[in-house]
Amino acid sequence: HNESTDEVVFNKTYIDFCQQPPLITSPGSSENPRGDKKLVLFFSIRSPYSYIGLQQAIKLAQHYQLPLDIKPILPMIMRGLLVPKVKKMYIFHDTKREAKKLGLDYGFVADPLGAGVERCYCLFSYAQSLGCEQQFILNYALAVNAQGIRAETDAGLKLIVQRSGMDWDHARTLLTSPAIDREWRQWAEDNRQQMLGQGSWGVPSFQYGELLLWGQDRIGIIEQAIREDRCNSECLFKN
């Protein structure tokens, strides 16, 4: 009998994740000097599994020097779908177990449902324009999943924005822009349709070339595909 439902009983996952040398690839473009396909992450700021998937995707992209394209999607409940309380509690405890295995902080949650999600996505394009979208999304995810920061408040959001190297005064003006609101809602839906159209129904989903996989526990398969590509590329480059 386990005293805690969050105890890690069996752990064989991720043991070799990003532990091997990244190999080399043939030269590519100036934007993608290694000539690799990019890594795409379909992501929801409210999804606990996306929180883990984000950190693993960033780690993977950095280890293999891959471009990472984060594509935010509205949470199911903000699209009119119901999530039973029992399922929510299962996800919380399961995420705690997964986070513990990976050495990630999780559990001091400030649910961003509603305004917290909207404000995140509203500022995402601004972060992209500064080239700091990964840092912004990561800081936001840490804030609402591990630090109990209420992103729907100006005080909470200001902290996240400033941690990400963004200008709070400018960010605040974007929050009340009808044009920005329409824009992010459109690209969030476009991202969802792209994900569905390629055969995945939920987040986090990872895409590398033609390979698209759902679930933060599948990212090891993505790494295998990267390594296979690099092995093949290295053989061609040598020949």
Map each language-model feature to its residues.
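Class I S-adenosyl-L-methionine
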Residues: 12-36
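Structural alpha/beta surface segment adjacent to cysteine/selenocysteine redox centers
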Residues: 51-147, 233-239
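Short glycine-centered, acidic/aromatic-flanked micro-motifs in structured strand/loop junctions
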Residues: 43-45, 110, 208-210
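Residue-level preference for long, well-ordered alpha-helices that form the structural scaffold
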Residues: 46, 84-91, 180, 184
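C-terminal cap of thioredoxin/glutaredoxin-like
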Residues: 1-18, 49, 53-60, 142-239
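A general structural motif
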Residues: 36-38, 65, 203
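Short active-site neighborhood of thiol/selenol oxidoreductases, capturing the structured segment around
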Residues: 33-49
